Structures are given as structure tokens and as C-alpha cells.
């Protein structure tokens, strides 16, 4: 009920988490440079903000990949609500990120703020580590 005045004044914008007509989670575009993708393995409809900056796509990894140590398959967190969904979403995202040369920005990594990716014999792995301020 506390949110009703904000909604009634037109200041509240709901985000449609369904990105396609098939009902799968998708992506919502806010501006030409800012979008949010949705994943549902860790929690339902968790938001991963994506920002295009200086020709790169920076993705805030939230709890899909909380640290660089979670990049290798099949590492997922034991308390994910749907760990098999996380694994599927992670695998798909890593291939997209590798192909698009995305910058991954980690929420919980105590050592590494960001990295890009490379394909190795053992799968997708971090390539270079750097601070967000270096972009």
C-alpha cells in the first residue's frame, strides 16, 4: 500500500520480465546503452544490468557469477533455488559473453572486480582481470 501513491502519480514503471512471446525470461531495454537481462536459477527473475560503454558491454553479474571462481562449469552456489537452471543460464551466458567480448563485473569477488573471457581447452575461463575504473 505504501507504493500506491508512487504508482498513481505515474512515477513507477514495472518491468516486463518476459522478453518473448514464448514466456521465457528475456531482456528489457531502458536506453540505447542500458538494459537488464533476467535469469531465474539463483532467485526468480534476478536482474543483471548491462551497460554499453566505450564500445564494450559491461554486465553486473549479481549471483549468476558472484566471483571469478564461479566461471568454470559446473560451479554454482549450493543455495541457488534452481541450480540446474543456473547451470543452463550460465552456460548460455558465457558463450554469449565470450562471443561479444563482454566485461564481467563481480558482486562478491574479494580480489577481482572485473574480467573478460577466453576459450581454453578446459572451457571458458577468465582472460584478464582489471578494475572497473580501468575501462
Q: Model-derived features: where do they sit?
A:
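Active-site-proximal beta-strand elements of phosphoester/diester hydrolases
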Residues: 33-40, 58-63
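Active-site beta-strand termini and strand-to-loop segments that position acidic
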Residues: 41, 49-54
Amino acid at each position: 500500500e505504501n507504493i500506491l501513491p508512487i504508482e498513481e502519480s505515474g512515477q513507477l514503471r514495472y518491468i516486463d520480465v518476459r522478453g518473448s512471446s514464448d514466456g521465457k525470461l528475456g531482456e528489457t531495454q531502458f536506453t540505447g546503452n542500458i538494459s537488464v537481462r533476467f535469469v531465474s536459477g539463483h532467485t526468480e527473475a534476478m536482474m543483471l544490468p548491462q551497460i554499453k560503454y566505450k564500445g564494450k558491454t559491461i554486465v553486473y553479474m549479481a549471483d549468476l557469477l558472484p566471483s571469478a571462481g564461479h566461471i568454470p562449469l559446473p560451479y554454482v552456489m549450493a543455495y541457488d533455488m534452481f541450480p540446474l537452471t543456473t547451470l543452463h543460464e550460465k552456460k548460455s551466458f558465457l558463450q554469449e559473453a565470450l562471443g561479444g567480448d563482454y566485461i564481467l563485473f563481480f558482486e562478491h569477488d574479494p580480489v577481482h572486480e572485473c574480467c573478460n573471457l577466453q576459450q581454453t581447452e578446459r572451457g571458458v575461463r577468465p582472460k584478464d582481470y582489471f578494475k572497473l575504473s580501468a575501462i
